[in-house]
Amino acid sequence: KTSILASAMCLAASSLCQTASAQIHLTADLQNNHLWRGMEVADGCLILTDLSYTFGAGHATLGLWGGTNTQGNYKEFNHYVTLRGAGFEFCAMDTYNFSPGATYNNRQYFNYKAHQTGRFLNCTLNYRFQQPRFPLLLSWSTIMFGRDRSADNTEQKYSTFVYAEYPVYKKDGWQVDAGVGGAFALNKAGEKQNFYGETSGVVHAQLKVSYDLKIGSYTVPVHAMGMWNPQSEKAYFQIGAQLIHL
């Protein structure tokens, strides 16, 4: 189901944008951990890489995203399609974390059977208000397929993460973004848990400070971020730099 959906979106984007110019982009970030929606996915020295192909005057992107750490206990490889326009952005990301020691199926990359697969398809719709004085970001993400199952592995739970973010400060190359997110399951399947926590509620709050550091003729985007999860009573600090931006 996931591969069919991704293929359909890719074909649709291609048919709409065949005559437009295309661009290849490569980024690589160095960070002390990987934080995602209230969770610390991995810690240690990490490299997170994004290789993408953008076409249709910037309205469509096909990409590969990967992450690993120096300890060798975190390995992730995803592919995605993104469509954007008029302030909206839709992204379908097929996520596969095959880190050693995982409690799910981390050995069969091409297994797309709902009750066996170790991957999940996360679909996100973002909207950024276009008014310069009110650049609020609103986001809705639902896991449509994969390892977001009921305890008896008979139903998909469609865990959903909703998020709002606002740039509270922007001056002299500095930017400060504040955000908050909550999670719940569209199909509770008789359970309280969802993909992000033990029950519905706020699982993510963050404050991120970014700066474009000038080193000679080079610009290195750097950031520091605090993230708090009130449900799990955990907090994390992240610092990172984008070493490659092509």
Language-model segment annotations:
Residues L207, E233-L246:
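Outer-membrane beta-barrel "beta-signal"
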Residues N32, Y53-F55, L83-G85, D94, ...:
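Residue-level signature of outer-membrane beta-barrel architecture
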